[in-house]
């Protein structure tokens, strides 16, 4: 993301002009734009024209509109963002108050104005404009007959290819059908890797599986690379890292990211930090339950006691339509930071973010036990009963 201009007043009102440069920037933009903001961008509008003879026709014209945002729609797989709203500035083609939908595009600038720029949104702009936050991890999660080829960016896990091949069971004295199907499966996975992984950007490719599938696959891939003189695969062989995962399903990627070998290789990436924080939370919940809580009320009470060491919070909560609720989460983040706590904002498009979402989207690891929080939890549950 490129920051063109930033004009924010002391009261935190103002506007920024940005240029999304890659697909992931559309996800950052989705998290920046909120209902009630004003968005100015170039767009296509269909307009009716009347000729001197009285015949009516229609043309598509490019014009610049400023909308008061009413709805935002994001397609995570296509990385497309559509913003619907009403026109709030005079325009020769569009009446004031008329509805229009702007489709924001990579490499086309837009200006976003808000009455209140909060700390979470401003931090996201800083991160989005930092080149160190680019996608640098890929993963192949596989089992016999099933594989997912994923890109792990700082903000999301993107499934780029799913490979499924029916593998017949081995039969006594006749393994040829099984072996042919397995080779066909491996070949399709290799093709998916070559099609979807950019080795100029990616620093590490995780190959995760149960059993010996990963070893057998890597042996096949590099034997074929030698035979066909595939320089791209051979030159990047050192980037492939084999790790254990319980299955070839996407959710098993979390296990691979938790592997200590992987964690050391990816120690500087946001994704690895999220995975470790969530893993630490689960361990604390199991071994010292008085130091691990989830749910907004419990976490707010822990914050009032100045007990929060690490706050885990989903970015989905900052997209809440209700301004008061959204502000409540922002205040929580600011307060934890002021009290020297660590804040981890999880992407809801990451496997770890999906898991945090199942725990209400907000959780905390405490510096010291707060037993009365557990008592309050028990009281509230008994009242519900």
Curated annotation (Swiss-Prot):
GO terms for cellular component: cytoplasm; cytosolic ribosome; Dom34-Hbs1 complex. Gene3D superfamilies: 3.30.1330.30, eRF1 domain 2, Pelota, domain A. Disruption phenotype: Embryonic lethality due to defects in chromosome segregation during cell division, resulting in aneuploidy and loss of genomic stability. It is found in: Cytoplasm. Its cofactor is a divalent metal cation. The keyword Heme does not apply. It comes from the Eukaryota. GO terms for molecular function: metal ion binding; nucleoside-triphosphatase regulator activity; ribosome binding; stalled ribosome sensor activity. The modification Phosphoserine is found at residues 374, 380-382. Ubiquitously expressed. One of its GO terms (biological process) is RNA surveillance. The keyword Cell division applies. Keywords: Cell cycle, Cell division, Cytoplasm, Isopeptide bond, Metal-binding, Phosphoprotein, Translation regulation, Ubl conjugation. There is a cross-link at residue 162 (Glycyl lysine isopeptide (Lys-Gly) (interchain with G-Cter in SUMO2)). Belongs to the eukaryotic release factor 1 family. Pelota subfamily. Component of the Pelota-HBS1L complex, also named Dom34-Hbs1 complex, composed of PELO and HBS1L. Interacts with PINK1. Interacts with ABCE1. Interacts with CNOT4. Component of the Pelota-HBS1L complex, a complex that recognizes stalled ribosomes and triggers the No-Go Decay (NGD) pathway. In the Pelota-HBS1L complex, PELO recognizes ribosomes stalled at the 3' end of an mRNA and engages stalled ribosomes by destabilizing mRNA in the mRNA channel. Following mRNA extraction from stalled ribosomes by the SKI complex, the Pelota-HBS1L complex promotes recruitment of ABCE1, which drives the disassembly of stalled ribosomes, followed by degradation of damaged mRNAs as part of the NGD pathway. This is Protein pelota homolog.
